[in-house]
Amino acid sequence: MALWGGRFQGETSALFKLFNDSLPVDYRLFEQDVVGSIAWADAIASVGIITATECSDLKKALNELLVEVKGDPAIILASGAEDIHSFVESALIAKVGDLGKKLHTGRSRNDQVATDLKLWCQSEGAALVARLQTLRSELIALAEREFDAVMPGYTHLQRAQPVTFGHWCLAYVEMIERDLSRLTDALKRANTCPLGSGALAGTAYQMDRHSLAVALNFASPTLNSLDSVSDRDHVVELCGAASISMMHLSRMAEDLIFFNSGEAGFISLSDEVTSGSSLMPQKKNPDALELIRGKTGRVYGSLVGILTTMKALPLAYNKDMQEDKEGLFDVVDSWAICLDMAALVLSGLVVNRPNALLAAQQGYANATELADYLVSKGMPFREAHHVVGVAVVAAIAKKIPLEAFSLAEFRTFADIIEADVYPNLTIEACLAKRDVLGGTALTQVKQAIAAKKVI
């Protein structure tokens, strides 16, 4: 039976029930709904709506229901209830009779679902924080393993300057740390309890909402009932934090897909995160990384979906807000498995050092060093930039690297070039000169890894 049937004389259509019911989605809030109901039983007992004995009986029945459903989750969907709140209330009434009908006194499904959803976000958010920390640890471990593996750094997907693989790993550590900061910050703002806000104007019973918030492990109660039941910022922020983090995961996946390609060959991926072709027996495809990249779009879509749903809703609650959960659940599921998969990919990744080094030695990645050398001899940088550009054109025409020019040939570009130019053009010199905070010099990479390990 619907919780709102008294107002209606006619039956709802089967199509409307199918359209209106949210149980196939919000069943995932079952545990939170029971926990919130237990706290609410204590709250209404505190203001004399039910006796201490009745409160104890309600809480016992709710805890029994929690155990039963954990043992057989299928009973929720088999119930045919309108939503998770209806399921819990009906199951409670089946256990304790008319006493179960007292539990909803002073409470609306509006503040109930707002509370359930915040509890769910807090629980899932804590698990996501742990996953981000695991991925961060894997990146740091990989950076330490491969801190001195040389590879080309890219701009515009063209070889630019040599860097180390450790430096590349640490770049993504920075991104993951920002993801952690964003998520924990969002969870702080979501750490307020809407329960007791009623449908929109506040409950009519003079209960202590601070105690209610503490009972549910919230930092504090919400302060405005209209906002409390209509606020979905926590959903938007969690989807937003996920979207930015997925962008980072997608960028990392794209880098690794390229590094793993036959055209680059800088890394090898473990068999456990790759798959083959049904036709081409030689293929070893980076499917885990491609799926991370692909799932990013659906996370973005859910963020846009909740923003669009909320953008024109008047205060307070509207049925549109029932659409907040499906996208949120998909976002959290997608983000969680992508974080787990990214960590697994990194744990089995091996750098093919000879290939990566050879690529770093090609493409005139030491051209900037030649320009800096000319600057050290007194030439203005803009002029040095032009001179080296001319030298690169000549080297390309001769199909040789810059360091293959003879001293006489070098002096046709600038007569200030001496024999000491050659040590400046080695890969080792290119790296060593970037010995500045945040640079790719081995000393800096080692220091950065050490600093990250103590955080």
UniProtKB/Swiss-Prot annotation:
InterPro entries named in the record: Arg_succ_lyase_C (IPR029419), Argininosuccinate_lyase (IPR009049), Fumarase/histidase_N (IPR024083), Fumarate_lyase_CS (IPR020557), Fumarate_lyase_fam (IPR000362), Fumarate_lyase_N (IPR022761), L-Aspartase-like (IPR008948)
GO biological process: arginine biosynthetic process via ornithine; L-arginine biosynthetic process
Catalysed reactions listed for this entry: 2-(N(omega)-L-arginino)succinate = fumarate + L-arginine
Record carries keyword Lyase: yes
Subcellular location: Cytoplasm
EC number of this enzyme: 4.3.2.1
Primary location group: cytoplasm
Origin organism lineage: Bacteria, Pseudomonadati, Pseudomonadota, Gammaproteobacteria, Alteromonadales
Name of protein: Argininosuccinate lyase
Record pathway: Amino-acid biosynthesis; L-arginine biosynthesis; L-arginine from L-ornithine and carbamoyl phosphate: step 3/3
GO cellular component: cytosol
One example GO MF annotation: argininosuccinate lyase activity
EC top class named in words: lyase
Keywords from the named record: Amino-acid biosynthesis, Arginine biosynthesis, Cytoplasm, Lyase
A Pfam family per the record: ASL_C2
The encoding gene: argH
Disulfide bonds: none
Coiled coil residues, start to end: none
Family classification: Belongs to the lyase 1 family. Argininosuccinate lyase subfamily.
UniProt key word Lipoprotein: no
